[in-house]
């Protein structure tokens, strides 16, 4: 079984916190939060790609 696509307990907890943060928002606020979250994920991807590309362990 491939567990790489499963969330850790900590990540599951983080999802619950996000849901609690999103529930009271109106549509526009939720959309803005989504855009900011996606931007953060993209920046994280860029950092990971940079580290892998510049890693001395290739």
UniProtKB/Swiss-Prot annotation:
InterPro entries membership: NblA, NblA_sf
Coiled coil (residue ranges): none
Subcellular location: Plastid, Chloroplast
GO cellular-component term (any): chloroplast
Record keywords: Chloroplast, Plastid
The keyword Chloroplast is assigned to this record: yes
Pfam families to which the protein is assigned, alphabetical: NblA (PF04485)
Main localisation: plastid
Family indicated by similarity: Belongs to the ycf18/nblA family.
Protein name: Uncharacterized protein ycf18
Lineage, opening ranks: Eukaryota, Rhodophyta, Bangiophyceae, Bangiales, Bangiaceae
């Amino acid at each position: 079984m491939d567990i790489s696509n499963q969330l850790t307990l900590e990540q599951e907890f983080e999802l619950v916190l996000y849901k609690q943060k999103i529930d009271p928002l109106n549509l526009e606020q939720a959309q803005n939060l989504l855009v900011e979250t996606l931007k953060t994920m993209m920046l994280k991807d860029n950092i990971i790609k940079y580290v892998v590309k510049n890693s001395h362990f290739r």
